[in-house]
Every structure is written in structure tokens, then in C-alpha cells.
Amino acid sequence: MKKALLVALAAMAASAFAEGPKYVFLFIGDGMSVPQRMTADEFSVKKGDGHLAMNAMPFTATTRTCSADSLVTDSAAAATAIACGTKTKNHYVGVDSGGTPLYSSAFFAKKAGRKVGIISTVTITHATPAGFYAHRINRGDTYGISLDLADSGFDLFAGGGLDVNEKNAKGHKSYAECGDIC
């Protein structure tokens, strides 16, 4: 009986692992690197709050996000590198250096039938979250980025901050239909 139970549990576990993870979360500390994490952790320990929870996560990674046209990488190029695996120019979001659209890991997850959500503490049209759904040569094209958001087919978007499109949206048909929701 014990052997049969063990075999059944092993089969269920193998089945669960064969399907892949149920959820995948990608946390991006925009502009944050190892020295910032070390400093914050040391501060937290000395303050008496213990180590940072993010340092206890089972899996962590760092990535090198080099811009294709500058020694200093901006958020748009960095987000594109993380999301799409391709180096691009500063200010470009979700496109390669020639302006050709790239597709992010989030698009491939959606195509594979997964639910996809983008959540950010900054506006949802900011370069970092936009790197996962937008295709623009100018990170400042927040109206175009918001159109890409609507076309993405993703399941959830949530962002913070004041809507940077407010002044451009007034007079647009969708603004008249929705009105001020804030």
C-alpha cells in the first residue's frame, strides 16, 4: 500500500512539474544593481529589521542591459533587453535598433495560453513596463504606447502615478466615453 501511494504521489508530482510553473513573477528594480541591494540589506540589518525579503527569494538573477548606442542605458533600452532579449538604442521600447518590432517573453507566454499581467508602481506607459508590450522608437510616445497596451491582448494592467496622457486624451473619443475615472 505504501509503495502504491508513493508511486501515485510521484506520478502526480511529475505531472505537475511537466506542466511547468503555475505562476512566474518578474520583479524589476529599475536602476537597481547589486551594490544598491547590498547597501539596503546592510541598512536594514543595522536598523534591526533583518535581511531584505528579496534576498531570501528562491531564485534571483541579474542581467546586463547594454544600450546599442550609449555607455549609459536608459529604462527603455534596458526593459527591451530584459523583456525581448535584444539590445536596442536608448529611447527605443520593444523594437530593435532599426525600429523593427520585437516580441517579449510576456507575448510568448500569452501565445502559449498563459494569463499575463503587467503591474508597475510608475505609470503603465513608462518605459520599463512598456518594454513588455509596446513597439515604439520614442519612449515619450505615451499615447502610442497606450495603443500598444490595448492591442497586446494581455489580461491585466495596473500602474501608479498621474496619467501622463491626460492633456493629450481630452477631446479624444475614448476620453469622452470614459470620462475622468480617477
Residues covered by each model-derived region:
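N-terminal catalytic scaffold of extracellular/periplasmic and nuclease hydrolases
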Residues: 19-182
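Short helix-onset patch at the extreme N-terminus, typifying the N->h transition
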Residues: 6-8, 59
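Positively charged n-region of N-terminal signal peptides that target proteins for export
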Residues: 1-4
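Hydrophobic h-region of N-terminal signal peptides that target proteins for export
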Residues: 9-18
